[in-house]
């Protein structure tokens, strides 16, 4: 089985919260696709709560589009990582890390402005697979933590995994 790009970086050296360009590609028609690693937590030291990350997923996707989409950028998808330390964001375009960090911080401020659970989008049995597993308070705590700590940049060249460690 081929080794995925996300497992070629040393998770023990990742900063968080931090933005990383995880992958870039060009489609046959010439569109640039960029995948960002939006790391909320330091891997193996912190983790996002299930209800918090789920609520954040519902809020973050819309808020990031509000702050980042434009004539040169269109978000395709924002999805939580299985390890619950962050999100992957795939988009058309090539915004830089600072543009993404600024949109992320603005989105976290928006999360703090949500007044109650009734304002969480798609919070119903028809649009959400586990609509009872949400916590606005936990999502807002995550947002507060990001704003308090700020968002830095993780560079792939600083995180390259030593090939000797790949066989462990």
Swiss-Prot record:
Binds 1 Fe cation per subunit. GO terms for molecular function: iron ion binding; S-ribosylhomocysteine lyase activity. The keyword Lyase applies. Its cofactor is Fe cation. Disulfide bonds: none annotated. The keyword Iron applies. GO terms for biological process: quorum sensing. Its EC number is 4.4.1.21. Gene3D superfamilies: S-ribosylhomocysteinase (LuxS). It is an enzyme of class 4 (lyase). InterPro entries: LuxS_sf, Metalloenz_LuxS/M16, S-ribosylhomocysteinase. It catalyses: S-(5-deoxy-D-ribos-5-yl)-L-homocysteine = (S)-4,5-dihydroxypentane-2,3-dione + L-homocysteine. Keywords: Autoinducer synthesis, Iron, Lyase, Metal-binding, Quorum sensing. Fe cation binds at residues 54, 58, 128. PANTHER family: S-RIBOSYLHOMOCYSTEINE LYASE (PTHR35799:SF1). Belongs to the LuxS family. HAMAP family: LuxS (MF_00091). NCBIfam families: PRK02260.1-2 (NF002602). Homodimer. Involved in the synthesis of autoinducer 2 (AI-2) which is secreted by bacteria and is used to communicate both the cell density and the metabolic potential of the environment. The regulation of gene expression in response to changes in cell density is called quorum sensing. Catalyzes the transformation of S-ribosylhomocysteine (RHC) to homocysteine (HC) and 4,5-dihydroxy-2,3-pentadione (DPD). This is S-ribosylhomocysteine lyase.
